[in-house]
Amino acid sequence: MMRVPTVPLPGMAMCNAMTIDVEDYFQVSALTPYVARSEWEGRESRVEPNVERILAMLEEYGARATFFTLGWVAERYPQLVRRIVAEGHELASHGFAHKRASEQSPEAFFSDIHLSKIVLEDIADVEVRGYRAPSFSIGPANAWAFECIERAADVTR
């Protein structure tokens, strides 16, 4: 088996990417059958202390990351979203309500990602350019989602 060097080769720079999904434990797709969206408000949130720990680690190592953040979380923790940006990280969208793209109509999907983009930009006062679909839910069967993402990207505050 050929080994890949763990340090840059002479004349080459090492480049890594770090991304974080900002969602609460009860919002993950695996829990959808057990935790209704109508129950989210009543759940004890862990997102704020968890993101604060991640921010502290990134600061300790001088690293930057992209935080794919739910609009739902941003509305409830605007100070956390502002801190992510203030500490030099990229803010990106993970949709508003962590709904799989594959389980939505094109219109519902566009509404979800559009709302998320507007909420994030209004709170953080930065342009949101990135998007990650919940549970990697875009594929050949719903390739229409790419057009929706492009349309949402063109929307300005």
Describe the function of each predicted region.
Residues 2-130, 135-157:
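Catalytic alpha-helical scaffold of carbohydrate-active enzymes acting on polysaccharides/glycoconjugates
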